[in-house]
Swiss-Prot record:
UniProt xrefs under HAMAP family: Ribosomal_uL4_B
NCBIfam families in the cross-refs: rplD_bact (TIGR03953)
Pfam families reported for this sequence: Ribosomal_L4
Protein's name according to its UniProt entry: Large ribosomal subunit protein uL4
Quaternary structure and interacting proteins, as annotated: Part of the 50S ribosomal subunit.
GO CC terms, sorted: ribonucleoprotein complex; ribosome
Family: Belongs to the universal ribosomal protein uL4 family.
InterPro entries reported for this sequence: Ribosomal_uL4, Ribosomal_uL4-like, Ribosomal_uL4_dom_sf
GO molecular function: rRNA binding; structural constituent of ribosome
Keyword Ribonucleoprotein on entry: yes
Amino acid sequence: MATTIEVKTPAGTTDGSVELPAELFDVEANIALMHQVVTAQLAAKRQGTHSTKTRGEVSGGGKKPYRQKGTGRARQGSTRAPQFTGGGTVHGPQPRDYSQRTPKKMIAAALRGALSDRARNGRIHAVTELVEGQTPSTKSAKAFLSTLTERKQVLVVIGRADETSERSVRNLPGVHIISPDQLNTYDVLKADDVVFSVEALNAYINAQTARTEKEGASA
């Protein structure tokens, strides 16, 4: 069953309501799936450029440090062996790709579960805009967001062309801004509340509906 939420305005009034489709905002959250998707997402962000030198890559050490026999010490062939200070590293990290392959349907299902969890707890909000007019105002945007939620971490989803809203909240601590096509499980779960502009909410719903219809037609 679709959930209806009110659309708030910066002036403190209500400008109608919007429906959150049940297939996107009221599905059972699969915790294991969300964990898998978030783990893959964070792994893909890793640069993987870490690198250590083996004994063959460390400069120097070509000369045998002392003769093979007669010193009473253990035989050594190079001062760049791992047991020496300044020597190579054994089994150290090497450059690698940490990204994992995650099917698109799993990514979409995890996002639906995360949004549904926030919606069931009343943490999805819809607004007409973050500030009135075309002049950015961090002070006004902060005051408006404080009327929506008192929690610290807020995910703001706005259209790419909404520069006024973006410039108004980009410096606010605890506020993360993304466009509807960038919406992902990690950002939703990290945020306490998700604030959609009506434009962004409709764009997300329409995109997901179109994708579902396309998948149904190709099945």
